[in-house]
Amino acid sequence: MAQTKRSRDESEKEEVVVKADVESSDVDHSFKSLNLSQPTMRAIEKMGFSKMTPVQARTIPPLMAGRDVLGAAKTGSGKTLAFLLPTIELLHSLKFKPRNGTGVIIITPTRELALQIFGVVRELMEFHSQTFGIVIGGANRRQEAEKLMKGVNLLVATPGRLLDHLQNTKGFIFKNLKALVIDEADRILEIGFEDEMRQIIKILPNEDRQSMLFSATQTTKVEDLSRISLRPGPLFINVVSEHDSSTADGLEQGYVVCESDKRFLLLFSFLKRNQKKKIIVFLSSCNSVKYYAELLNYIDLPVLELHGKQKQQKRTNTFFEFCNAERGILICTDVAARGLDIPAVDWIIQFDPPDDPRDYIHRVGRTARGTNGKGKSLMFLIPNELGFLRYLKAAKVPLNEYEFPTNKIANVQSQLEKLIKSNYYLHQTAKDGYRSYLQAYASHSLKTVYQIDKLDLAKVAKSYGFPVPPKVNITIGASGKTPTVVKKRKTHKH
C-alpha cells in the first residue's frame, strides 16, 4: 500500500497540463480527423455535428490513445461527447458482446443528468451492435437487474443505485470493465456521495481500466477522488484558461436591483412580455417552485416545474416536454442546474440568488451551450445582496446592470393578495414557499452577503401575496436544533 502511495505521489509530478486556447490553430476540429468507426461517424452526421468544441478537440485524441484524463471543463462545453466517443469506440474495437457484461460505466450525480447522457448514448450507438442501459435511483430496481443480467455493455448510472447493483445484483458482470467515466465529480461529492464513490472504486476492477474524471470546479475532494480513481500521471486538460471568463462566451449576463416586495411583480411582468421565448427560472427551494408554478398557472401564465419533491417519472416527463417545446417557461430548483442540455434557452432568470459563484456558473451554463451558443441571463438582487457582485467579479464573471422602467411593471399586488386570501390551497402553498425561502436564505453559506436579519420580512411576505408576514417556524443551521419563529419583521431566537 505504501508503495503505491509513493509511486503515485512521484508520478503526479509527471502530470501533463494542457492549456486549451480556444482559437488554437494546431488542433484539427473536424470529427473526420478522428478516424472514427463507420457506425459512430454515421451517428455523428445524423446528429448534425461536423466540428468539435475546444474541449472535444483537446480531450478525444488522448482518450482514444488510452490516456487517463482529468478534465476541467465548464458546463456547456461539449464534454458529454468528449467522453462518449472514445468509450463507444473502445467497445466497438474490442467487439464487446452482451455476454462480456459491462465494459464502460459512466457515473453522474443526478437522475436527470443520467437520462440526458443516456439520450446521447442512444443516438451515438444507433448503428452499433453493443448494448447500453441506465440505472438510477427512483427507477424500477428489478427491471434494471434483469437487464444487467442479460449484459449491458455501456452503463450510465447514479452513484447510489450503481453501488446497490454492484453489491447485490447476482449475474451483473463487470469484471471486464475497460473504462470508467466520472462526470460532474465536484457535484457528486457536493451532494454527499463521497463514501459511495470510494466503495464503488474499491469494487470495480482497475487492472487495465482507462478512467476519466470531469469537473467544472477543482476542489481538494475532487483531487482526492481523482487520486484513487485515475492511474498515476493522468493528462490534465484545462479548457478554462487563466484569462478566460468562467461562463460560456456567447452569454450576455446582467442583474437587476429590486426591493423584495417588487420581485414577483417584476418577474411576472418580464415573463408576460417574453411568452414567446424559452426561459428557465431558478428558485432556492422546492416549496417556492411549487407556489410560483401554481400561482402563475392559475393566473394563466403557463409554466412547467421541476424540483426534487416530484416523482422521477414526473421529472423526466417535464424535462423532455420542456426540451421539445419551441417556447415556454420552466421554474426549477438547482437539481436541474447541472449539465442538463436543454437546447436553445433564451433566458436564465436567477430569481433567488445562488449560494456562491460556482452555483451561478452552473445555473447559467444552461444557455449559450456548444460551439455557437447565444443566450441571456438575469439575476435578481435586493439592495442588501449587492456584495455578491464582488464574488462574481473575483470568479471572472462579467455582469452588466439592467434597469426596468417602473411604469412597465404590472402592479398586480392587490389582485395577488386577494387571490391568496380567498384561495385556501394557494394560501397554504404560499405560506410553505415563504417559509422555505427564509429557511434557504438562513442556510446560505455567504453569510456576509445573505444576512437573514437584514431581510425586510414585510416586503418578502408581499412577494408571496401576504399583506402581513404569516407566522412560520424555521430552523437555522445544519443541525436543525435552533427553532426560530419569524413573526412580523422580527426574528426571535429561543
From Swiss-Prot:
It comes from the Eukaryota. Keywords: ATP-binding, Helicase, Hydrolase, Nucleotide-binding, Nucleus, Ribosome biogenesis, RNA-binding, rRNA processing. GO terms for cellular component: nuclear envelope; nucleolus; preribosome, large subunit precursor; small-subunit processome. It is found in: Nucleus, Nucleolus. A motif (DEAD box) lies at residues 183-186. A motif (Bipartite nuclear localization signal) lies at residues 262-278. It holds the Pfam family DEAD. ATP binds at residues 73-80. A motif (Q motif) lies at residues 29-57. InterPro entries: DDX18/Has1_DEADc (IPR044773), DEAD/DEAH_box_helicase_dom (IPR011545), Helicase_ATP-bd (IPR014001), Helicase_C-like (IPR001650), P-loop_NTPase (IPR027417), RNA-helicase_DEAD-box_CS (IPR000629), RNA_helicase_DEAD_Q_motif (IPR014014), SPB4-like_CTE (IPR025313). One of its GO terms (biological process) is snoRNA release from pre-rRNA. The keyword RNA-binding applies. It catalyses: ATP + H2O = ADP + phosphate + H(+). Residues 60-236 form the Helicase ATP-binding domain. Its EC number is 3.6.4.13. Residues 1-23 are annotated as: Disordered. Belongs to the DEAD box helicase family. DDX18/HAS1 subfamily. Associates in the nucleolus with the 60S and pre-60S ribosomal subunits. This is ATP-dependent RNA helicase HAS1. The lineage of its organism: Eukaryota, Fungi, Dikarya, Ascomycota, Saccharomycotina.
